[in-house]
Amino acid sequence: MLIPRKVKHRKQHHPRQRGIASGGTSVSFGDYGIQAMGHAYITNRQIESARIAINRHIKRGGKVWINIFPDRPLTKKPAETRMGSGKGSPEWWVANVKPGRVLFELSYPDEKIAREALTRAIHKLPIKARIVTREEQF
């Protein structure tokens, strides 16, 4: 699981999700990538699930890059707790994703298998996304 080793503050505010990604919008490491088409908080479990889906489909001979990192804590209060008495404890770590951001990149010799692997990963994510190649831009 991806979580930060050390953070300055355990709890953070939750900003509004607006605007488009200013960086990380093109495929720079691999040949194919998954590009977000909307806003979302993607948890560390969802990132790991998508990574496993890609690796299981391509088996060997390819390389996967994860371009996002869950660095924001989301808090939650326990069930059946009255309102007040402070903010809840951190439950998940999420990555704040904006439209245009490339989430995963893949380098694999066979295009058909690479696209199928990325499609399986997209189904694991709570966001609309598309497959882009190195030549395409947002």
From Swiss-Prot:
KW tRNA-binding (keyword) present: yes
Region described as Disordered: 1-24
GO terms, molecular function: rRNA binding; structural constituent of ribosome; tRNA binding
PROSITE patterns xrefs: RIBOSOMAL_L16_1, RIBOSOMAL_L16_2
Feature: compositional bias, Basic residues: 1-17
Keyword tags: Ribonucleoprotein, Ribosomal protein, RNA-binding, rRNA-binding, tRNA-binding
GO biological process: translation
A GO-annotated cellular component: cytosolic large ribosomal subunit
InterPro entries: Ribosomal_uL16, Ribosomal_uL16_bact-type, Ribosomal_uL16_CS, Ribosomal_uL16_dom, Ribosomal_uL16_sf
Record family assignment: Belongs to the universal ribosomal protein uL16 family.
Function description: Binds 23S rRNA and is also seen to make contacts with the A and possibly P site tRNAs.
Quaternary state and interactors: Part of the 50S ribosomal subunit.
Protein name: Large ribosomal subunit protein uL16
Species whose genome carries this gene: Mycolicibacterium gilvum (strain PYR-GCK)
Gene (UniProt): rplP
